[in-house]
Amino acid sequence: MLPTLFSSTILAGALAGSAMAQAPDAGCVLPSEPKGIPAAIDAAITGPADKDRACMKALLIREARMMFVSLGADGAPTYTLQTLDDWIARVKARGHTMLEEKQLKFHTDRYGNIAHIWSSYALYSDGKQVARGINSIQAIKEAGGWRVTGIMVQAESATAPLPKKYLPYGRQA
């Protein structure tokens, strides 16, 4: 349950030097390039579970959906589809629990005003690693910067470990 709940906590990492643009209606910043999305998501997520999510709301378009894929007992994939408000309510229920998602490795593909970011992550709750997985993020360029249109997440499991190529320097740890 914990990896499924938190695998939605999306991306992390410190990306220095990416220019940011003002986000609509929240006083937050939007990335000026798709490669800045992981750092923007990290900043919007990291902190107490019940913190204000205005920056996360500014980063995702209103119609954005988050899909959490998991494997059932029979190994068949299942999914849960949520709005950002659904996700915020689930995370907020954890109270002051500290959340932190650390990006392990990512790459970005861009064509014109659309981009896809494929990112592996490790998720921490109160300093303890509770999950790892992959985030598939779609984004669009708007006048104020890049915004997320959708996120699909699958947490690592015993039958679906993270491949070496998605870990820093190819490590399996």
Question: Which sequence ranges carry the predicted segments?
Answer:
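A mature extracytoplasmic/lumenal domain signature
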Residues: 60, 70-72, 119-121, 135, ...
